[in-house]
């Protein structure tokens, strides 16, 4: 199965290669409307959903991030999310609000392999942004990650392998990764982990203890597109 992954679009909708599943690890909304709920909804309906529905893939699986205030307010309303994203796209768009989704991929005629994807928007606290929680609540949220998770998409970067290390501007050299997310990853051992949030965190694929990791932010710390979506076979 070929997957693509990106994060931190901030309103930029990139060209996407053909793949089976395309993953988006949060911070979808344009910065200039992130606090405006009516404009955010209109942008999702009139711009994001048509773009995602037209991508050359079977499914687009996405989560929210700390700039996605509309999802902080509405993302937990499962029926509303179903009617807004799933129903009008015949199931192509899948929004995960700290939950799992399973996909059966046909690896050869009549033979299917199941993949379990868990997505969480929750981040460690740093300012007054969406989905930021104190450690005890983060631990409770991350505990929902299944022990048989194949693919993890998180907005926050775990404090592992430099995924959350800032490489640009005044904070360069600081590891802003999330230790509570890292702890849960080490407990549950998902096979593939994709994140964003720390725009200049370590991109490319890294391997540790049989797991593969990548920060897939599209933009740099100045919110300028500096990276491309990542593609790999799983």
Residue ranges with predicted function:
Residues 102-113, 180-192, 199-234:
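Binuclear metal-dependent phosphoesterase catalytic core
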Residues 112-151, 171-179:
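Binuclear metal-dependent hydrolase catalytic cores centered on His/Asp/Glu-rich metal-binding motifs
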Residues 10-11, 29, 67-69, 122-125, ...:
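Short, solvent-exposed loop/turn segments at secondary-structure junctions
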Residues 5-7, 22-27, 59-66, 95-98, ...:
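Active-site neighborhood of phospho(di)ester-bond hydrolases with catalytic His/Asp-centered motifs
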Residues 29, 34-44, 79, 127, ...:
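Active-site-proximal segments of metal-dependent phosphoesterases and phosphodiesterases across multiple
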Residues 1-3:
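Extreme N-terminal starter segment of soluble prokaryotic enzymes
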Residues 6-107, 177:
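Core catalytic region of metal-dependent phosphoesterases/phosphodiesterases
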């Amino acid at each position: 199965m070929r997957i693509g992954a990106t994060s931190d679009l901030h309103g930029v909708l990139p060209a996407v290669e053909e793949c089976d599943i395309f993953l988006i690890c949060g911070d979808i909304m344009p910065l200039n409307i992130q606090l405006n709920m009516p404009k955010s909804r209109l942008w999702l309906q009139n711009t994001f959903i048509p773009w995602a529905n037209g991508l050359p893939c079977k499914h687009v699986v996405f989560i929210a991030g700390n700039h996605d205030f509309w999802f902080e307010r509405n993302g937990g309303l499962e029926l509303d999310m179903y009617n807004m994203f799933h129903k009008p796209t015949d199931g192509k768009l899948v929004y995960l609000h700290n939950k799992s989704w399973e996909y059966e991929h046909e690896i050869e005629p009549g033979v299917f392999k199941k993949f379990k994807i868990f997505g969480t928007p929750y981040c460690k606290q740093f300012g007054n942004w969406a989905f930021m929680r104190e450690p005890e609540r983060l631990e409770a949220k991350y505990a929902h990650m299944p022990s048989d998770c194949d693919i993890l998409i998180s907005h926050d970067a775990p404090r592992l392998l430099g995924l959350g290390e800032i490489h640009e501007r005044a904070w360069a050299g600081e590891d802003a990764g999330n230790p509570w997310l890292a702890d849960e990853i080490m407990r549950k051992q998902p096979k593939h982990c994709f994140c964003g949030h720390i725009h200049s965190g370590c991109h490319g694929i890294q391997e540790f203890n049989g797991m593969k990791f990548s920060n897939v932010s599209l933009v740099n710390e100045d919110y300028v597109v500096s990276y491309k979506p990542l593609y790999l076979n799983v």
